[in-house]
Amino acid sequence: MFVTDFRKEFYETVHNQRVLLFVASDVDALCACKILQALFQCDHVQYTLVPVSGWQELETAYLEHKEQFSYFILINCGANVDLLDILQPDEDSIFFVCDTHRPVNVVNVYNDTQIKLLIKQEDDLEVPAYDDIFRDEAEDEDLSDSDGDGSEPSEKRTRLEEEIVERNRKRRQRREWEARRKDILFDYEQYEYYGTSSAMVMFDLAWMMSKDLNDMLWWAIVGLTDQWVHDKITQMKYVTDVGILQRHVSRHNHRNEAEENMLSVDCTRISFEYDLCLVLYQHWSLHESLYNTSYTAARFKLWSVHGQKRLQEFLADMGLPLKQVKQKFQSMDVSLKGNLREMIEESANKFGMKDMRVQTFSIQFGFKHKFLASDVVFATMSLMESPEKDGSGTDHFIQALDSLSRSNLDKLYLGLELAKKHLQATQQTIASCLCTNLVTSQGPFLYCSLMEGTPDVTLFSKPASLSLLSRHLLKSFVYSTKNRRCKLLPLVMAAPLSVEQGTVTVVGIPPETDSSDRKNFFGRAFEKAAESTSSRTLHNYFDLSVIELKAEDRSKFLDALVSLLS
């Protein structure tokens, strides 16, 4: 059921309990977790934190801890499946679910006892009515009941005939109801999409309780920016949520106006920015940032010689010397940095790039540590998705979580360096895929498969990294192809996962269009294609549009997907 009063029905309920916190491996979930941790520390709430990267880990962790806890909080996992069916919990277990995955499973919505959904009702959820999905068991029992009293034979026969007619009518009604139910559930469940950032939901709770701090506000901003970076929400939703957070930024700044105007070693200041859509440019050179931003790489077609010439023309149009562009942004001439944003935007307009700036936020720690929200998203994600040889998944999770604290800026800077390598690997892989024509049309969708032995291939076996690569590849492909039909197609991408087990990670990405509602139909399509061909798949990720597949079953799985979507 949906929780209406988060403070009373959630926070005050767990306030005096020992709580188990299951947190998914995405940046928004980490930010929501940081806000909740800060609230729990403030109120001395006892909790245990368990990172989970998929359903198997969640089930295992629940079985391991269920004896010690009655209250469980799930962040960015659990809303879009029948949670009670998966976990088979004891009757006294209560689950609070704060999850951005949509649609919300109908059993979770209508379970009043064990499932408590911490989900904003303003999100357009369109949950089907209870009576359209669930039927009273007593009605079904009526169908099988037959009367056997001692009436006269003729009377009995007449009543029996009436009962048969009535039973047939009820059976027909039931069949019609079941057919309608199937259609309603299909319409409701066919697309996967995302709701309000969990970090924003948790910040809202802190604000309602008058416990919101600047740090919490920053984590809410990073959570929202994570959704924007990964194309999980529409531009309209992003701008609306930025507006909500902007009001909080103004409120916090006004409250601390005297200190904020005086920068000090200890100060933390958040500012609204209308900044450049260039990745990590303040921590890199402008040249590297232009090369490794998906928007500019796609628009200039930087995988081609012609595209690289166009980039040189773009820099010449701005009047920026190559020496300045290729050195670290921090070392650039101050006179050039002053109006750099305006210069870039003006030249970008001439080159047909209208979206070079975006509404965002920055944070400044003391005199010299300044970060854009997107810098933190890339750094944190890179720490979390580092290849396993550098440590376990839990180690990476804890390191990523730590990097969000001001006291661990060294970890954040380490994340920025990793992010640069990841972004370079992404653009090099895109260039390789486009130059060797690895993206092919399968009819209803485009398909691309990374081969074992491809440079950096281990990096793209992770779901977030592969999804980001797929989105950026699709964007670049749309600008590179002359085939109009192909520009409107979605993309399915595969990358090797485990050579020993012979498995690949497969991700499905919706079409790259300006009007896209960011809804993804691949989750259900993958499920049906696997079922119809008995392909050995593992639907282990919280995002339904990412699966593990046995490499041997790939061709029959793809054939089924083609016929399903044709």
UniProtKB/Swiss-Prot annotation:
GO terms for biological process: DNA replication initiation. Widely expressed. It is found in: Nucleus. The modification Phosphotyrosine is found at Y130. The modification Phosphoserine is found at S144, S146. InterPro entries: CDC45 (IPR003874). Residues 138-161 are annotated as: Disordered. Keywords: Cell cycle, DNA replication, Nucleus, Phosphoprotein. The keyword Nucleus applies. Transmembrane segments: none annotated. Residues 138-152 have a biased composition (Acidic residues). It comes from the Eukaryota. Pfam families: CDC45 (PF02724). GO terms for cellular component: centrosome; ciliary basal body; CMG complex; nucleus. Disulfide bonds: none annotated. Associated with ORC2. Interacts with HELB. Component of the CMG helicase complex, composed of the MCM2-7 complex, the GINS complex and CDC45. Required for initiation of chromosomal DNA replication. Belongs to the CDC45 family. PANTHER family: CDC45-RELATED PROTEIN, CELL DIVISION CONTROL PROTEIN 45 HOMOLOG. This is Cell division control protein 45 homolog.
